[in-house]
Amino acid sequence: MSERNDRKVYVGRVVSDKMDKTITVLVETYKTHKLYGKRVKYSKKYKTHDENNSAKLGDTVKIQETRPLSATKRFRLVEIVEESVII
């Protein structure tokens, strides 16, 4: 049980929902430069399993690490934190 709780959890923004049951989530993190101490923004995209196709473009979502579901998918959708507003 404790092993399941040690899985990585990220919060990011959906940048693509064109695939069936798959979304692409952009996760932005900050790291401090070792020499200069300046915070530098890094971003990474994760393909995420969305069983019900519930997440839409621009939504803020929480994803969790899981077993490999395909060649590129290693995360699953936990919840939609905030839905995007379409103007």
From Swiss-Prot:
Keywords: Ribonucleoprotein, Ribosomal protein, RNA-binding, rRNA-binding. One of its GO terms (molecular function) is rRNA binding. One of its GO terms (cellular component) is cytosolic small ribosomal subunit. One of its GO terms (biological process) is translation. InterPro entries: NA-bd_OB-fold, Ribosomal_uS17, Ribosomal_uS17_bact/chlr, Ribosomal_uS17_CS. Pfam families: Ribosomal_S17. One of the primary rRNA binding proteins, it binds specifically to the 5'-end of 16S ribosomal RNA. NCBIfam families: PRK05610.1 (NF004123), uS17_bact (TIGR03635). Part of the 30S ribosomal subunit. Belongs to the universal ribosomal protein uS17 family. HAMAP family: Ribosomal_uS17_B. PANTHER family: 40S RIBOSOMAL PROTEIN S11 FAMILY MEMBER (PTHR10744), SMALL RIBOSOMAL SUBUNIT PROTEIN US17M (PTHR10744:SF1). This is Small ribosomal subunit protein uS17. The gene is rpsQ.
